UniProtKB/Swiss-Prot annotation:
Keyword Metal-binding: yes
Binding site for substrate: A154, H155, N235, A236, R243, D269, G270, T271, H272, L328, S329, G330
Class of this enzyme: hydrolase
Gene Ontology CC terms, in alphabetical order: cytosol; nucleus
Keyword line: Carbohydrate metabolism, Hydrolase, Metal-binding
Family assignment from sequence similarity: Belongs to the metallo-dependent hydrolases superfamily. NagA family.
Effect of D294N: In a colorectal cancer sample; somatic mutation
Residue sites binding a divalent metal cation per the record: E143, H211, H232
Note on cofactor: Binds 1 divalent metal cation per subunit.
Cofactor (UniProt): a divalent metal cation
E.C. numbers: 3.5.1.25
UniProt-recorded name of the protein: N-acetylglucosamine-6-phosphate deacetylase
Biological processes per GO annotation: N-acetylglucosamine catabolic process; N-acetylneuraminate catabolic process; negative regulation of UDP-N-acetylglucosamine biosynthetic process; UDP-N-acetylglucosamine biosynthetic process
Length: 409
């Protein structure tokens, strides 16, 4: 926590000639920053009788909350599911490179792996604040190994697991300590899954439903046990059927706890999800849509063979497959590309597209007071965009951490 006195004495930055995303609208207002947080200018004027120490003209551009990616498996040759002696350096590389795509916070994601990989990797990726070194780490997303064999997708079958008699202890034996974990994806139809969901939720860990053959009733029961997220909607789950819509049916279910918002990840890369499916999901439940990249180590590398955990992946153009198959294996589209494709495919408002990559993931993780918003008091993590939503600059805690060459003075 920053000291109030220290913050009060810090320099005040005023970002002018901009449109800021606040309250679901793009407003022609200035953005004020001090001590790494968004400042209320009225308090500055009337209570402290101060003005800005520095003004920065944004040239009419958009200022939106920094993007938050809650499912990213690696990128730029780094595979988070590879048990190396220096996992941290790989995470740092990805954290630095994704700044150019407007991402200010992320959840490094591990795909299904043997226990020894989790035991070696998980302790090496702690929660970390963002800054000039790169985007902040909000905690790990462990996708598998407690998932369906039928809907395993690119996850290696040899390492899939079901829950043993003492289910939560079995999970701990698989993963090791959970201090660095923020999200766990599991299949709710697995025996004893509900006691695991309750135990994880009690520890403040978000439970996501995915890689599953669960019917709607099983999915609803999982939500009552504490699940709040769906991993890459439509992918690796039963297809929608009018008599039993499966997990997809959670978007419009009337059998959920009162006031509970179900969030769901969407890979809007132009490959994983047909534009019509994107439109259906968004129109059915817009406030729960969370854009994710599901990016793999091949992000930024081009065609050829790469790894993803224990599997080989082949990239051909804009698509990644498990080598030798036509099974999709994550995405190679960065977050800003997903935002632009989502906007174009759904015809939604620019505000909605931006909130799907910022506010909604923050709400999913319970961080909406500090992340995913430009409200007063929030962290000054934001992205500067042109009218076509190309990233011009990225700020973390009010500090410029990346700038496009064309935007440099």
């Amino acid at each position: 926590m920053r000291g109030e006195q220290g913050a009060a004495g810090a320099r005040v930055l005023q970002f002018t000639n901009c449109r800021i995303l606040r309250g679901g609208k793009l407003l022609r207002e200035d953005l004020w920053v001090r001590g790494g947080r968004i400042l209320d200018p009225e308090k500055l004027f009337f209570e402290e009788r101060r003005v800005a120490d520095e003004r920065r003209d944004c040239g009419g551009r958009i200022l939106a909350p920094g993007f938050i990616d809650v499912q990213i498996n690696g990128g730029f040759g780094v595979d988070f599911s590879q048990a190396t002696e220096d996992v941290g350096s790989g995470v740092a590389l990805v954290a630095r490179r994704i700044l150019s795509h407007g991402v200010t916070s992320f959840c490094p994601t591990l795909v299904t792996s043997p226990p020894e990989v989790y035991h070696k990797v998980v302790p090496q990726i702690p929660v970390k604040s963002g800054g000039p070194h790169g985007a902040g780490v909000l905690g790990l997303h462990l996708e598998g190994p407690f998932i369906s064999r039928e809907k395993r997708g690119a996850h290696p079958e040899a390492h899939l697991r079901s829950f043993e008699a003492d289910a939560f202890q079995d999970l701990l034996a698989t993963y090791g300590p959970l201090d660095n974990v923020r999200i766990v994806t599991l299949a709710p139809e697995l025996g004893r899954s509900h006691e695991v969901i309750r135990a994880l939720t009690a520890r403040g860990i978000c439970v996501s439903l995915g890689h599953s053959v669960a019917d709607l009733r099983a999915a609803e029961d999982a939500v009552w046990s504490g699940a709040t997220f769906i991993t890459h909607l439509f992918n690796a789950m039963l297809p929608f059927h009018h008599r039993d819509p499966g997990i997809v049916g959670l978007l419009t279910s009337d059998r959920l706890p009162a006031g509970r918002c179900i969030f769901y990840g969407m890979i809007a890369d132009g490959t994983h999800t047909n534009p019509a499916a994107l439109r259906i999901a968004h129109r059915a439940h817009p406030q729960g849509l969370v854009l994710v990249t599901d990016a793999i180590p091949a992000l930024g590398l081009g065609n050829g063979r790469h790894t993803l955990g224990q599997q080989e992946v082949e990239v051909d153009g804009l698509t990644a497959y498990v080598a030798g198959t036509k099974t999709l294996s994550g995405s190679i589209a960065p977050m800003d590309v997903c935002v632009r494709h989502f906007l174009q495919a759904t015809g939604c408002s620019m505000e909605s597209a931006l909130e799907a990559a910022s506010l909604h993931p923050a709400q999913l993780l319970g961080l909406e007071k500090s992340k995913g918003t430009l409200d007063f008091g929030a962290d000054a993590d934001f992205v500067v965009l042109d009218d076509s939503l190309h990233v011009q600059a990225t700020y973390i805690s009010g500090e410029l951490v990346w700038q496009a060459d064309a935007a440099r003075q």
